[in-house]
Amino acid sequence: MLIRLLLLVICLAGPGVAEEIRIKDLVRFDGVRGNDLLGYGLVVGLNGTGDGLRNAPFTEDIMSNLLERLGVNVTGEQYRPKNVAAVFVTATLPPFARAGAQIDVTVSAMGDAKSLLGGTLVMTPLNGADGQIYAVAQGTIIAGGVSAEGQAARVVQGVPTAGTIPEGARVEREVEFEFARLDRVRLALRSPDFTTAGRIEDRINRELGRGVATMLDAGTVSLDLGRLGPPARVMGRIENLEVVPETVARVVVDQRSGTIVMGEDVRISRVAVAQGGLTLRVEEQPMVVQPNPFSRGETVVVPRTTASIQQRPGTGLAEIPAETSLSRVVAGLNALGVAPNDMIDILKSIHAAGALHAEFIVR
């Protein structure tokens, strides 16, 4: 199967022109973060695609506990519905979220349910790492796939055993954080870089005065807010200031999907590339051999192997000049007429030869 190739070229507005980015898009406020929430509950209303209670006994326990809380006595009763599934529910409580705010949740099957499509999550408390309940989730699930089956076949597209509920949880408890009392805040860069951190320091000091911002390292800029007024107002001014971030030459390769992403600053030294195009094919076709009549012989299966080697016409040796930009790299690889999966191997080889001057990430 051919590996699909998606080559994304990140181009700037014009040659030699760098774009200014807001500081809020380059950093996060140290200590201001979301909190993960987790709960487990029941999804009801499934069209016969729920848990098989023999294989997922915890579903019956969860259902019994829920019905007992609602005043329904189920002690000693045996019931095996197919429209119920036990699920894990996860969400992230954003910073500064107030009671009554609604947040998105993700629902994932715990047992052997075939699909959560069309199901409804019933009231499920969501706990934080401290064991306290911070939100309650409930709503109709939007599944990410679909499945259909008959007596002898089943077709599945996507992942029908997981889904989301947009704004499916309501915040019940707030995380206390007194931002207004802070007199010092640290900015944490999303992509640490000394040059970018220095530019952020210079830009803030030009706007608010010398000594307000101090670069501590490649990933941290400290702010002294004590003499500038209310911290929220000051941070509102700072986060909308713009700087030019330093870009890093980077190539990211995803071997599973055949995706290659390269930034504009990728350069390579002078190098020659040849691509082989050798294909080896081995097939096994077992053959049944019957004995002669009345020979008392046995029927046996004889292995039969067919092997072949195919060599595509050579594309020759292609030379890529020194200090070649991204566009020339793409043109050079396309000139070889290589397949997408071969292009990934060529990039690996160029990097191994020391000619690709960029961070090379393989996933």
UniProtKB/Swiss-Prot annotation:
InterPro entries membership: Flag_FlgI
Keywords: Bacterial flagellum, Periplasm, Signal
Gene Ontology MF: a single term: structural molecule activity
Keyword Signal: yes
Subcellular location: Periplasm; Bacterial flagellum basal body
BP term (GO), one: bacterial-type flagellum-dependent cell motility
GO cellular component: bacterial-type flagellum basal body, distal rod, P ring; outer membrane-bounded periplasmic space
Main location: periplasm
Segment forming the signal sequence: 1-18
Source organism superkingdom: Bacteria
Similarity-based family: Belongs to the FlgI family.
Record note on quaternary structure: The basal body constitutes a major portion of the flagellar organelle and consists of four rings (L,P,S, and M) mounted on a central rod.
Function: Assembles around the rod to form the L-ring and probably protects the motor/basal body from shearing forces during rotation.
Protein name: Flagellar P-ring protein 2
Encoding gene, per UniProt annotation: flgI2
